[in-house]
Amino acid sequence: MKKLIFMLLLSSGLIGCSAIDYSELSSPVSPSDTQIERIISLGLSHSDSLLEANKLMDPDLVAIVVKELENRKVKADEAQIEEGIVAEYAEKIIILENNSKFIGPEINVRRKVGLMLESDYEDYYLKGQKDLGNGSISHQLYLSLKYNADKLRNYNSANFCDKWQDCSSGKKIVVANIQSGAGSCSGSNCEYREIFELEFTDEVLKSYMNDGLSFVITSKRNSNKITIPANYIKGYLRVSN
């Protein structure tokens, strides 16, 4: 009998616990958040929103609300600029073969190397091929490296950098050297060019849309860090996907 009573009391206690309204335990909305959302809901211009914030009676509350409104304005402006750059890249995508082939605009980078003020020239663009049968897309990065040296560098491997730009232990990238050779020479140095294609899956490329994609391509004695901006990737994928 005692055991039965104990079980009844225990079950009623559990039922009581399950009936607790946990929404009441959530963090209360601060006065500043309330005022910020109220002002934003008015649909005012930024300057008028600041005027509305300055009507508040508490000077400390005014300072907090104004600061947050300014921060949101900066973020909105940055997002607008970013969208403009993305749209510009997207407009430059070349579409071929019944919407199955995509070629992005070429990016040209001049990079100073060494103490002799020599320069490496890095030219690259993304291109993609869509399988019209199953809709899958494969992507390649066309990369041209031009430099002056006493011999060909023979780049042969590449690996990703992480979001902290550490490239020492990143995953390997499939690299195909499709062309290399020397141009004009002066003394012991010649102008060399090596051209590569690097393979990226659609999933991998999409994972770098927010932070951009950086990788290091290396030879026995040299390494070059290549960075594809996030807005370039977004513009390219906006069209290719």
Where do the PLM segments sit?
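Classical Sec-dependent N-terminal signal peptides that target proteins to the secretory pathway
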Residues: 1-21
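A generic "folded-domain core" signal
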Residues: 18-203, 207-210, 217-241
